[in-house]
């Protein structure tokens, strides 16, 4: 394990492989091991120095309980703390879901530190009114169940997670996940960053994801973007389908000078 320190919050990360540095950042309730589970690291490490990061509040990173400490700019600065700890001036970045939100934060505050940004299942618009089902605000529903404990939250997930995923989800600290969820729900609109994202960007999303309309819209305002729509996949499916996603990612990265 490796740790960086960002204003007293320790950020856990793992390094695999050699080559140009590539940061991997997971989504809400997840951890860095997911990139290994679904085959991303095994493929990417053949070409890249893969740096998988546990977001604050997740995995082996520190877990503050104050939602203000999960502000997108602060979480973006966690990534910079990892780069600085490893003396890396510039890297590629790939983030899914909450990790995608952090990616927009990096574009806003630290664009000079990245050769490229790969953002999945996320857009820069407000999320408070996100509905995965008509009339149901997704993050409010998630918070309501989390307030009763991780077991209640996990019990409401459909389809039910397998044993490995179940064990992981139940290991989360509910107070930290609540704080991170509140911050994600209440984050401001930063769509004004889109026209400034001049570095090569790949944006991808499953077309059955509730975030798809906003994600499809945001790429219209990005000057240097490759858009990948993944047919038949919802928000939970995409991370697991490295067989579908990785060819797009590898092709995109191979064409960056």
Residue ranges: model-predicted function:
Residues 9-62:
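Conserved HGGG/HGGXW glycine-rich cap/lid loop of the alpha/beta-hydrolase fold
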Residues 220-236:
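Catalytic histidine neighborhood in serine/cysteine hydrolases
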Residues 101-109, 115-146:
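Flexible "cap/lid" loop of the alpha/beta hydrolase fold
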Residues 178-193, 208-210:
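Active-site nucleophile elbow and catalytic-triad environment of alpha/beta-hydrolase enzymes
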Residues 42-45, 52-92:
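Active-site loop/oxyanion-hole signature of alpha/beta-hydrolase fold enzymes
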Residues 233-246:
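Catalytic histidine-centered segment of alpha/beta-hydrolase-like enzymes
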Residues 91, 95-100:
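Conserved alpha/beta-hydrolase "nucleophile elbow" surrounding the catalytic nucleophile
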Residues 197, 203-205:
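Short beta-strand/loop motif that positions the catalytic acidic residue
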């Amino acid at each position: 394990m490796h740790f960086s320190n960002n204003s007293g919050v320790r950020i856990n990360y793992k390094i695999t492989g050699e080559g140009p540095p590539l940061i991997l950042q997971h989504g809400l309730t997840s951890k860095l091991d997911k990139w290994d589970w679904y085959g991303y690291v095994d493929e990417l490490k053949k070409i890249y120095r893969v740096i998988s990061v546990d977001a604050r509040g997740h995995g082996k990173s520190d877990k503050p309980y104050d939602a203000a400490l999960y502000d997108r700019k602060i979480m973006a600065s966690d990534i910079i703390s990892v780069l600085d700890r490893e003396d890396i001036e510039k890297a590629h970045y790939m983030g899914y879901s909450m990790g995608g939100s952090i990616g927009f934060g990096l574009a806003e505050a630290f664009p000079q530190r990245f050769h490229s940004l790969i953002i999945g299942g996320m857009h820069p618009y407000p999320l408070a009114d996100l509905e995965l089902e008509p009339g149901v605000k997704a993050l409010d529903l998630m918070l309501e169940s989390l307030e009763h404990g991780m077991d209640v939250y996990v019990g409401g997930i459909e389809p039910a997670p397998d044993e490995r995923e179940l064990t992981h989800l139940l290991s989360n600290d509910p107070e930290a996940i609540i704080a991170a969820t509140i911050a994600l729900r209440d984050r401001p609109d930063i769509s004004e960053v889109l026209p400034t994202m001049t570095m090569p960007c790949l944006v991808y999303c499953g077309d059955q994801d509730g975030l798809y309309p906003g994600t499809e819209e945001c790429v219209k305002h990005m000057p240097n973007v490759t858009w990948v729509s993944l047919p038949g996949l919802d928000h939970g499916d995409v991370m697991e389908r490295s067989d579908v996603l990785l060819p797009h990612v590898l092709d995109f990265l191979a064409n960056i000078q």
